[in-house]
Amino acid sequence: MKKLTAILLAALLVFSFAACGQNGGPGKTGEVSVFYYTFSDTYISSVRTAMDSYLKANNIEFNNYDANGNQTTQTEQVQTAIAKGSSMLIVNVVDTGSNDAAQNIVNLAKAANIPVIFFNRSVDESVVSSYDKCVFVGTDYEMAGHMQGKMIGEYLVENYGKVDLNGDGKISYVMFKGQEGNMEAIARTQYGVDDCNAVLTAAGKPFLEFYDPSNTDKYLVDQDGLWSSAAATNYLSTALAQYSEANGNMIELVIANNDEMALGAISALQAAGYNTGSGKVIPVFGVDATDAAKNAIANGSMIGTIKQDADGMANVLVQLTKNFRDGKATFDGVDAANVIGTWRVNIPYATYTGEN
């Protein structure tokens, strides 16, 4: 009887782990291989958590890989997974500055005759369309910048006098860019300001003014391309030592490409005595609507963000995975309104200010 019980327990353990993923383990034949540009990105971690749950719920064996921001590492991980017999690649590509990295991964998948699904970080249509078993799941990356800019502009029109700390009739801002060469970062950096200026102009207010006139780029970029809170904290801590109310040239507005950088900026502001829950607030805006950002909005240290739906993205990724696995039409079960041509699914954005 004891022997039978032991056998049954062993069988249950095997079943319970059948759909579980590892984090960059050795890999095995038939599994779905999921590659993340980094595990440390808060939004991407939200996608990973949701996707792990959906994959397990659908009894899909999978393995997660962390490239830690290194494209060479990710490409080697892809090669290893294919050599181990992976049945499908789901890729959050590291390098978005050119088509080379994504095209190389497509070529590897094509040679192995397995599907590849890219997500979140932009991959050009020409790359995706070069293989009939390749699709991309992302967002209308320009829309996040447009929505953020409009949200900022409307907030400033309603609160102009309060935000204009030095009373010069203009709003001085800092922009934190996540990565050079990344299409999402480029669009958010441009439209976050342009669309805000359009709202200000319509209200008879002057354009935003970048705090440092010597910076012709009009942004500060994470040199590691990781969209990190640390980069924003370091930049803003340094800037606040020179640009302050005491000097009459205060930074009065913070715009960030993502919530991680927005939260990093808040850390620097709080160290300088702002956004602490009492006293003066310098408005901070981000993108992603992470839980940490929602908490910051709730406690008043952040004003607003643009929701990037991590759960919605994970759900679509797993639906596409099942479609490829089961031989169904690629976009079966996906909202047709979000399907672009034969190569892409866009996950909608939404504004988030804590009131919606």
Where is each model-derived feature located?
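Flexible loop/hinge segments that line or gate small-molecule binding clefts
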Residues: I105-M143, M147, N159-S172, F176, ...
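Extracytoplasmic "Venus flytrap"
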Residues: T29-A50, Y54-L55, N63-T80, S86, ...
